[in-house]
């Protein structure tokens, strides 16, 4: 393999890994056939792919301003794509949740669930309600997420955490096992296993 092929291989490897990350984080959208939302989530991938492909054109120019302009435009495109990949309501809800304002997060997630009743929106609503100690509402929201997508593991996981807080150990164990069998992100899998060990 020549030295010119190495950047090509690295670019395609980067594009492939980026797509895998986007796909694995959004399998629920694929199951729900929400192609528009999936495409929106893939905008940063598209921007990165465009940047990677345009690199081959830019390499031929010797003027420094071309490379600097390319870097600036590519960076701006990636930032813009990242901003557009998630709705402003979801971004505000996520920010409220991360900052501990669970009441505001619940309001915004409820708005999202009413606007577009995806399993993820109901699961996020359930998480915010659970963090607000509104346990019955949280269980209802997570149950609605499971009805919408029985393979959405995060809904089982969130419901299990709330059931555990409510003292319903056997139901929590059942949901944690379901979460591990379903489509649960890797970082939650280890937490689910640890909680199962504690409850056993």
Whereabouts are the PLM-identified features?
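Helix-start (N-cap) detector for alpha-helical repeat units in TPR-like alpha-solenoids
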Residues: 86, 119-120, 153-154, 187
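Long, contiguous interaction/recruitment modules in multidomain scaffold/adaptor proteins
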Residues: 1-94, 98-100
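Short coil turns that delineate tetratricopeptide repeat
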Residues: 116-117, 150, 184
């Amino acid at each position: 393999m020549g030295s010119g092929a190495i950047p090509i291989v690295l670019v395609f490897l980067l594009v492939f890994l980026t797509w895998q990350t986007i796909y694995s984080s959004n399998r629920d959208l694929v199951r729900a056939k929400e192609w528009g939302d999936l495409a929106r989530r893939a905008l940063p991938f598209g921007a990165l792919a465009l940047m990677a492909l345009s690199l081959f054109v830019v390499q031929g120019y010797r003027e420094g301003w071309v490379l600097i302009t390319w870097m600036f435009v590519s960076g701006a495109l990636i930032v813009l794509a990242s901003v557009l990949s998630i709705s402003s309501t979801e971004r505000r809800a996520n920010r409220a949740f991360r900052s501990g304002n669970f009441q505001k997060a619940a309001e915004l997630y409820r708005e999202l669930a009413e606007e577009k009743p995806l399993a993820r929106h109901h699961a996020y609503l359930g998480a915010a309600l659970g963090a607000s100690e509104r346990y019955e509402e949280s269980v209802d929201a997570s149950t609605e997420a499971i009805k919408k997508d029985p393979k959405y593991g995060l809904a089982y996981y969130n419901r299990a955490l709330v059931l555990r807080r409510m003292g319903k150990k056997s139901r929590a164990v059942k949901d944690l096992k379901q979460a591990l069998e379903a489509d649960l992100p890797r970082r939650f899998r280890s937490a689910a296993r640890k909680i199962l060990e504690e409850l056993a």
